[in-house]
Amino acid sequence: MSKKLRIIFAGTPDFAARHLDALLSSGHQIVGVFTQPDRPAGRGKKLMPGPVKVLAEKHNLPVFQPVSLRPQENQQLVSDLNADVMVVVAYGLILPKAVLDMPRLGCINVHGSLLPRWRGAAPIQRSLWAGDSETGVTIMRMDVGLDTGDMLYKLACPITAEDTSATLYDKLADLGPQGLIETLQQLADGKAQPEVQDEAFVTYAEKLSKEEAQLDWSLSAAQLERCIRAFNPWPMSWMTIDEQPVKIWKASVINREAKAEPGTIIEATREGIQVATADGILNLESLQPAGKKAMSAQDLLNSRREWFTPGTRLA
């Protein structure tokens, strides 16, 4: 293989762990792993390690969990490892310029979009909601900006009409390691060809909120269907029926004129709950009332048919 690199890996969730797993079999030397501090989880709020820490400890790698990399003593942890490159994947902490400049070859990041489209925190969800036909991963050299660094490698994948954020996440988690290993080989061989991002094509993927997951019936059926897929599995699209929140797991578009005010129930059958939108009809197929598991429209109608009387306006 190419020259063996000394690598610091920084990441926290499962998406990052899949990249660390690929590095473990790449032949490069992982000299340290930075990951976020353990977080309370579950009903007992017990402190639990993230997937990257679990994998790193399984392979006896040195693990560091600073709350911030701004203090000088925490930056010294990075410096002391004398790394050739730092690989950052969904780490969750800001890297100050001093840290970015420490590795000989700099810091590189795996980002879940085809930059410069969808810089920011939620590129997978935003690409789905926008109706993009494809997305992918970009390996970039990090600088002090928000996903503004020069691009080193890009891999694309199609977005299908069935994709949710969960399925797209899995696709990109498989693509990313391929691009990362190839990029590291290019860096080691001195063959990397950085490409400056074109600012004319920049879009931003703002962090998701539970509030924007509430279905807005003034949008079209196509937009709402994409919203439902984009917000699955978090924070989940929802609506209010009889003053109770109901999450929507799956829906489809019926391309015909609603002939009713947006948010009005048109029909309720075993195939779904048909709701008028600003353009077309949204057919709700899988729903989850508060405190219940997700169920088909038919199962929900069996217990709550009074909720779905044609002519009822949904909030």
Swiss-Prot record:
Alphabetical keyword list: Protein biosynthesis, Transferase
CC terms in the record's Gene Ontology section: cytosol
Pfam families named in the record: Formyl_trans_C, Formyl_trans_N
Catalytic activities: L-methionyl-tRNA(fMet) + (6R)-10-formyltetrahydrofolate = N-formyl-L-methionyl-tRNA(fMet) + (6S)-5,6,7,8-tetrahydrofolate + H(+)
Family matches, as SUPFAM superfamilies: FMT C-terminal domain-like, Formyltransferase
Residues reported in the UniProt entry to bind (6S)-5,6,7,8-tetrahydrofolate: S113, L114, L115, P116
Record-listed E.C. numbers: 2.1.2.9
Enzyme class, broadest EC rank: transferase
Signal peptide segment: none
Matches recorded under InterPro entries: Fmt, Formyl_trans_C, Formyl_trans_C_sf, Formyl_transf_N, Formyl_transf_N_sf, Formyl_transferase-like_C_sf, GART_AS, Met-tRNA-FMT_C
GO MF term list: methionyl-tRNA formyltransferase activity
Stored Gene3D superfamilies: Formyl transferase, C-terminal domain, Formyl transferase, N-terminal domain
Family to which the UniProt record says this protein belongs: Belongs to the Fmt family.
Biological role stated in the UniProt entry: Attaches a formyl group to the free amino group of methionyl-tRNA(fMet). The formyl group appears to play a dual role in the initiator identity of N-formylmethionyl-tRNA by promoting its recognition by IF2 and preventing the misappropriation of this tRNA by the elongation apparatus.
Protein name, UniProt field: Methionyl-tRNA formyltransferase
Organism, as annotated: Enterobacter sp. (strain 638)
Organism phylogeny: Bacteria, Pseudomonadati, Pseudomonadota, Gammaproteobacteria, Enterobacterales
